[in-house]
Amino acid sequence: MAAQEEPAQPGDSLATLKSESDTLKSKLEEERAKLHDVELHQVAEKIEALGQFVMKTRRTLKGHGNKVLCMDWCKDKRRIVSSSQDGKVIVWDAFTTNKEHAVTMPCTWVMACAYAPSGCAVACGGLDNKCSVYPLSLDKNENLAAKKKSVAMHTNYLSACCFTNSDMQILTSSGDGTCALWDVESGQMLQSFHGHAADVLCLDLAPSETGNTFVSGGCDKKACVWDMRTGQCVQSFESHDSDINSVRYYPSGDAFASGSDDATCRLYDLRADREVAIYSKESIIFGASSVDFSLSGRLLFGGYNDYTINVWDVLKGARVSILFGHENRVSTLRVSPDGTAFCSGSWDHTLRIWA
């Protein structure tokens, strides 16, 4: 009688699967390398370098009682929503620095906030694991909390949220390792996105009008590009050495940048399916918390944990400016919709408008 085969130990099968996946990964890298025929800085050699340019703080927005964690511009290029560790969400007029609305959330650490495309609502959330939408009205004295609508529920903290191209749907990312698309009206989940192995920290929607993709980054050091219709991860990039804190699409939608705790920002080309540039200097040793592109895509602004904002020439990979002003780490940064200025939020409790 044939000797009975020993049942495979769970540990053995796991080890073989891991080595198989590592082999497949290295094969993939080899295939990718075959298409890798030119570097971005070589292509950009003939392009004129940017000179040093001066940007100054034009406005300082004071009113939060604790660390500013997130901010977003309204499409009207004038209003800003910001959220803070003090549990407050404030809508500002960036021209006059006046506060137009303020909401106190039931929890502290409001890590995510977003303006609706119409400018008539804001969404926010954080340690309450929820994403809440507040409709804004012209009546400045109205109690916004009474009109609150809870849209999304995760099983861990909400790390980021953004509306799709309408007020009717909202994308969220969470510490539970997932992203999800929700219907604002009904609060139903329309699609969930599983693929990260740890907390998802950031997301950004593709800029095209038909924007059916978005990118997310997280504590698994991985950036994933997702198809919103199928819920599938269509591309993933793993080259950072630490958490990815921020991702932002290039204005054309063909690439995206990421900022990480490994003190680098990186540019990934979606068509070439690989990393094409690293923005780093030996003197920069603190993590990048947030990144955003200028309207032309030539500049990349990075907010860092050493209280500075570094401005990079995207094509040349060189730093063209360094901005001082904040007195604690820069936690969030967004370029205004018309590209004339950008706003940064910091753990020093303030927001600054630079131009």
Swiss-Prot record:
WD repeats lie at residues 63-102, 105-144, 153-194, 195-238, 239-278, 280-322, 325-355. It is found in: Membrane. Keywords: Membrane, Repeat, Transducer, WD repeat. Its main location: membrane. One of its GO terms (molecular function) is signaling receptor complex adaptor activity. Enhances GTPase-activating protein (GAP) activity of regulator of G protein signaling (RGS) proteins, such as RGS7 and RGS9, hence involved in the termination of the signaling initiated by the G protein coupled receptors (GPCRs) by accelerating the GTP hydrolysis on the G-alpha subunits, thereby promoting their inactivation. Increases RGS7 GTPase-activating protein (GAP) activity, thereby regulating mood and cognition. Increases RGS9 GTPase-activating protein (GAP) activity, hence contributes to the deactivation of G protein signaling initiated by D(2) dopamine receptors. This is Guanine nucleotide-binding protein subunit beta-5a. The lineage of its organism: Eukaryota, Metazoa, Chordata, Craniata, Vertebrata. The gene is gnb5a.
